[in-house]
Amino acid sequence: MAFGDVTTPQGLKELNAFLADNSYISGYTPSKADLSVFDALGKAPSADNVNVARWYRHIASFEAAERAAWSGTPLPQLAGGKPTVAAAAKPAADDDDDVDLFGSDDEEDEEAERIKQERVAAYAAKKSKKPALIAKSSVLLDVKPWDDETDMKEMENNVRTIEMDGLLWGASKLVPVGYGINKLQIMCVIEDDKVSIDLLQEKIEEFEDFVQSVDIAAFNKI
């Protein structure tokens, strides 16, 4: 018997001995078997059970949603002192044999590295499920008219008729440039992968009865 009722001191001791040679309750990755023992314990064990404490911290480091998605089969009823996991029989030993005073640092390092790699793999899998971030830019355009007789309101209306996938027009204002002439400053937000700022400038300049030139006054990544 590997371990029995983990809510009893004896069962906890047996679980500690089991986890001295095993990283997980079943197999080489966390599963519902680990979750059933984790839930049965209810709280972190004392530091005296060093192997159980290490395993408990590792399982607790996963979010509840991640633990719920683990595969495998939960262990049967844990109470009653009945065995939950089978293990190869070991010869009886004195209590002193349960404590390895000269444990291998290499084994501990390998275990820590393996757990680290598993965490990295789990994080990468979680991250891959998140939607990709969309690169956007905020652009301030200076749209200059031919002269002071240009209908600036009509010019702005024409500019705002331009529609492109990934283009969103923002606030605008008229800025004096001299001799009674105003230029139109208009803000827009573009998705970098969808909107070419050069093409947008060309489309604005197509309103040649109103627009003399278009310049980029400011360009910032969002």
Swiss-Prot record:
The modification Phosphoserine is found at S104. Keywords: Elongation factor, Phosphoprotein, Protein biosynthesis. Residues 94-111 have a biased composition (Acidic residues). GO terms for cellular component: cytosol; eukaryotic translation elongation factor 1 complex. GO terms for biological process: translational elongation. InterPro entries: Arc1-like_N (IPR053836), eEF-1beta-like_sf (IPR036219), EF-1_beta_acid_region_euk (IPR018940), EF1B_bsu/dsu (IPR049720), EF1B_bsu/dsu_GNE (IPR014038), Glutathione-S-Trfase_C_sf (IPR036282), Transl_elong_EF1B/ribsomal_bS6 (IPR014717), Transl_elong_EF1B_B/D_CS (IPR001326). GO terms for molecular function: guanyl-nucleotide exchange factor activity; translation elongation factor activity. It holds the Pfam family Arc1p_N_like. Phosphorylation affects the GDP/GTP exchange rate. It comes from the Eukaryota. Residues 90-111 are annotated as: Disordered. EF-1 is composed of 4 subunits: alpha, beta, beta' and gamma. EF-1-beta and EF-1-delta stimulate the exchange of GDP bound to EF-1-alpha to GTP. Belongs to the EF-1-beta/EF-1-delta family. This is Probable elongation factor 1-beta. It comes from Drosophila melanogaster. The gene is eEF1beta.
